[in-house]
């Protein structure tokens, strides 16, 4: 089984410039999900939305082409893709010729779909429907000037002057305000930080929490988000941990957690988890991305 420790992270790596799908390194979601009590049917919906800022290939005449790429990986897929392997895979397009943009998109979709769904069919009937492919969108240079920058909407938790003493996840800080009427509100913070579980490099994020139910104590919520500061976990895993801690501790009627992480190696990852069916948020970067 692939683990973070035997991934390309933290290792000296040769950068290949000829297409090689074997560079992709999927890691099973199940191990970290078991830590937060998710072992059967998922209690959430959603996806991991990636943006690639460093994608290039050659056309059939050898002329370089560039694009921004957006990828949408369903959270029900059994695997995540380790980000350095994703970067190495994209770099392998650099000196590879493709007939057109559609050929690049098709290759990306096929390879990434195979990686995130790998091993999904081991115990599945041969008559079962094929798993969905991931979403792939390429944005060409003539549209670059239309790329917006938006901050996450919501009431800022960062306005609160709280004392912070916990720097590893402390779900006991989460609580609801007793004897208050139910609310529907959207809260945001720019203070989420965690670390890569292999290299220890910092991962910075803005997070948005939308919920309906008993009002969540905002000071405790901010302290809880700050408590991830020295925590070692991948982006997707942090967001699922936040979702499950809120879901089990505060018992909202509805809940959605969305984080936008700053880019590393030309890639950003923006996980979204929700307790109910809804459209994915627009994959629009914020100022720090």
UniProtKB/Swiss-Prot annotation:
The active site of this protein is located at 196, 203
Could you say which residues bind substrate here?
A: 81-83, 235-236
Q: Record-annotated residues binding NADPH?
A: 83-84, 264-265
Task: Report the principal subcellular site.
Answer: cytoplasm
Q: Which UniProt keywords apply?
A: Cytoplasm, NADP, Oxidoreductase, Queuosine biosynthesis
Catalysed reactions, as listed in the record? 7-aminomethyl-7-carbaguanine + 2 NADP(+) = 7-cyano-7-deazaguanine + 2 NADPH + 3 H(+)
Kindly give the InterPro entries that the UniProt entry links to this protein.
GTP-CH-I_C/QueF (IPR043133), NADPH_dep_7-cyano-7-deazaG_red (IPR050084), QueF (IPR029500), QueF_N (IPR029139), QueF_type2 (IPR016428)
Q: What is its EC number?
A: 1.7.1.13
Q: What is this protein called?
A: NADPH-dependent 7-cyano-7-deazaguanine reductase
Q: Which gene encodes it?
A: queF
């Amino acid at each position: 089984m692939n683990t973070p420790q035997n991934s390309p992270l933290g290792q000296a790596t040769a950068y290949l410039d000829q297409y090689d799908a074997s560079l992709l390194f999927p890691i099973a979601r199940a191990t970290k999900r078991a830590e937060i009590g998710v072992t059967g049917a998922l209690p959430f919906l959603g996806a991991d939305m990636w943006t690639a800022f460093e994608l290039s290939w050659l056309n059939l005449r050898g002329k370089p082409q560039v694009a921004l790429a957006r990828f949408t990986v369903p959270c029900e897929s059994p695997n995540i893709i380790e980000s350095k392997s994703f970067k190495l895979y994209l770099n392998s397009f650099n000196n590879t010729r493709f007939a057109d943009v559609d050929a690049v998109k098709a290759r990306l979709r096929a390879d990434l779909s195979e990686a995130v769904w790998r091993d999904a069919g081991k115990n599945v009937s041969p008559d079962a429907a094929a798993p969905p492919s991931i979403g792939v969108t390429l944005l060409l240079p003539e549209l670059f000037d239309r790329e917006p920058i938006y901050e996450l909407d919501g009431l800022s938790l960062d306005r609160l002057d709280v004392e912070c003493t916990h720097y590893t996840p402390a779900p006991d800080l989460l609580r609801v305000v007793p004897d208050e009427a139910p609310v529907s509100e959207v809260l945001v913070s720019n203070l989420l930080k965690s670390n890569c579980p292999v290299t220890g490099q910092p991962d910075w994020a803005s997070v948005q929490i939308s919920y309906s139910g008993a009002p969540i104590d905002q000071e405790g919520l901010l302290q809880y988000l700050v408590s991830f500061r020295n925590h070692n976990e991948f982006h997707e895993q942090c967001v699922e941990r936040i979702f499950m801690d809120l879901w089990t501790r505060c018992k909202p009627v509805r809940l959605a957690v969305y984080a936008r992480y700053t880019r590393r190696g030309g890639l950003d990852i923006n996980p979204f988890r929700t307790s109910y069916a809804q459209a994915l948020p627009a994959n629009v970067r914020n100022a720090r991305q």
